[in-house]
Amino acid sequence: MKCPRCSKQEIRVLESRSAEGGQSVRRRRECMSCGYRFTTYERIEFMPIMVIKRDGSRESFNRNKILQGVMRACQKTPVTVRQMEELVNEIEEKLQLEDAQEVTSLRIGEMVLERLQHLSEVAYVRFASVYRQFQGIKDFVNELEQLEPPLRRDLERLLQDSSASDSESSGSPDLVGEYS
């Protein structure tokens, strides 16, 4: 390996450790010629996966494309960069473990949506609007209606739990009855 500063090949490894949940090795290196220190990452090289796009064309799987789309969808949400990177790592790992040489862009999009729904509903709807090519407000409404039942169940459960504990302890009004 060459030094990124002076291009000499006199490099020594100062430290090695597992990174990305064991998916890579992080090495801290030092050039013996100029003293420059830098970090490298080693990853397993998987078989290349070809993505079949909507128009039938094929291109190599590019995790950065997925990450960019997820980052756009997650702008101004509480989702962290680490969570976004983990989402992309999960998808890439799942595809590699399936040992598929080809995958459709539609399948990748569904995998992203499935994971975004658990991270941020706002990011989910943003990603879905591009991925599913929403044409108008009706498309947004339809997508939101599909998200609504789990939210309604969670809200009803929360209100029931709250009213049960309130009525047992203080005799306060039944919130579920007032808002049903």
Swiss-Prot record:
Biased composition (Low complexity): 160-174
GO biological process terms held by the UniProt record: negative regulation of DNA-templated transcription
Cofactor(s) this protein cannot do without: Zn(2+)
Cleavable signal peptide: none
TM region positions: none
InterPro entries assigned to the protein according to its UniProt record, in alphabetical order: ATP-cone_dom (IPR005144), NrdR-like_N (IPR055173), RNR_NrdR-like (IPR003796)
Cofactor note: Binds 1 zinc ion.
GO terms, molecular function: ATP binding; DNA binding; zinc ion binding
Source domain of life: Bacteria
Domain ATP-cone: 49-139
Pfam families in UniProt: ATP-cone (PF03477), Zn_ribbon_NrdR (PF22811)
Positions of unnamed zinc fingers: 3-34
Keywords: ATP-binding, DNA-binding, Metal-binding, Nucleotide-binding, Repressor, Transcription, Transcription regulation, Zinc, Zinc-finger
Chain spans, region Disordered: 155-180
Function: Negatively regulates transcription of bacterial ribonucleotide reductase nrd genes and operons by binding to NrdR-boxes.
Membership in a protein family: Belongs to the NrdR family.
HAMAP family according to UniProt: NrdR
Protein name, entry field: Transcriptional repressor NrdR
Gene: nrdR
